[in-house]
UniProtKB/Swiss-Prot annotation:
The keyword Cell membrane does not apply. This is S-methyl-5'-thioadenosine phosphorylase. It comes from Caenorhabditis briggsae. GO terms for cellular component: cytosol; nucleus. Disulfide bonds: none annotated.
Amino acid sequence: MVKVGIIGGSGLEDPNILLNPTAISIDTPYGQPSDHLIQGTINGVECVLLARHGRKHDIMPGNVNYRANLWALYSLGVDVIIASTACGSLKEEVAPGHLLFPDSVFDRTNSRKATFFDGTFSGAPGVSHIQAHPTYNEKLRQVLISTAEKCKLVHHRTGFGVCIEGPRFSTKAESMVFKSWGASLVNMTMMPECILAKELGIPYATTALVTDYDCWKDEDQVTAASVMKVFAANVEKAKTLFIEAVAEIGKIDWSAEILQTKTAARQSIMISPDVEVEFLKVPKT
């Protein structure tokens, strides 16, 4: 049966969504993940929960050890990953309290370790020129969308986010430029998480929890307090979504999807095909 990794953003680090939760401490070649990983089940499906910012929310977006987080989930054998992320809206119709299921991302980060293939001692062999499109696994994305429809949660099926370095919010000039690009969201944690999952050959999709209108909208000033107030209201929606989505994911045979994802990741590496990459092993056909 499939094993689901869940990366929870702000507010979604509650281990009580799991039955029989067990905390697991893991060290990785890339250092420590953000917190203990919590293993348990949801609707009979094995799950591993990781709080992206730590359970005390004391790790800012640029300091999250994304590589360690993804490697830790891989080492516990997760087959697919679903995530949540708080976002500001760049479109009037994408209102605070809504959910959006991104289909792409524009990367504006500048100081994050964004690949496992970095030539260091701990790094994977070779150089990976991973295809960044499609950014998210479409089959997994559709499960989240259909679950939101089933749960009658107000949501948007498509849209892309601009991922900024943070931890500050956008300037007015930045917000207006991002809006002019046609982006739906501005965010601080979409990258490089989705790309690292692709490098590991793990299907990944995220749910954007809209907390505010970014500062392009003059009448709404973005503050940490206002963001957290709306986010607190979103948390219960996201929990409902994930609990139901995990049940749906558990009904699906993911073997072909995982094979395709791992094969694509292996083919992206500039290295002799005879070199074995342990974490991208696929069954012989």
